[in-house]
Amino acid sequence: MLDILTIHWNVDPVLLHLGPISLRWYSLLFVSGFIFGWYMVRSFYRREGVDERLLDPLLYAMLISVIVGARLGHCIFYDPQYYFGSWQGFLEVFQPWKGGLASHGGAIGIIIGLLWYTNKYGKKEGFDFFWLADRIVLVVCFAGACIRLGNFFNSEIIGYNTTLPWGIVFDRTGDPNPKHPTMLYEALTYLTMGVVMIWLYRKKLDKLYRGELFGIFLTFCFGMRGLLEFTKAPSVTVFTIGDVVINMGHLLSFPFAIAGIAFWIWSVKRGVPATIQRQPYRTPKKA
């Protein structure tokens, strides 16, 4: 009877085979996050009078920053001995399809990419790093949810054994025990945060300070990420406190959350309005 009630997950991670090319669910959801994000940022730019011609450079900067940052993050944080211990491993650093990506590295990459972009384009348009970061984190919430759904299709980022009714048997792993679907917990967290932060942006932006949404995002996103790590089977254990395992995810998440609290407080004390005070930008008419 219990086996009948157990949720099994055995979906092929490959959505479509096109000759030698395979389209994976993860890739589709990853790209969908960027496409959806582009349209979100376009709506922000239109609403606040920023030149839409700056959207494409932002897209390229984010694509490069996320992929490079996430790949280096995986190699440095999770398996440096392999990737930097031999030439074979080092060459695989440049082959992200062999190994993985790390979200904390992707976050660092996004920050670096935004610093470059705002330094190059922001002064002319009247915005700075924190103005743009306040809006990009809204995109990151929904893109992060898409990526975690991609992890679900890949049967990865799986938690410990559980007897809870929503525990899932991931048949493709070969383990018959129900597990915490940690990737779905994270997807739901990011989606909920995205809805709340869109509401703050749409309804309360005139009452917020520049950098405040960025601080709120770091605080709650990585705070929750750190807590959810306690349900996840660790890939790299850093140390233990009694029966409690502290893994690399904890070690990377909580500093981000603490930084978020600091940015949140600093933005309120600084008191710079979150908006750009000017007329909305009008897209040039075609001749």
What are these regions (language model features)?
Residues 1-287:
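A feature for loop-to-transmembrane-helix boundaries and adjacent hydrophobic helices
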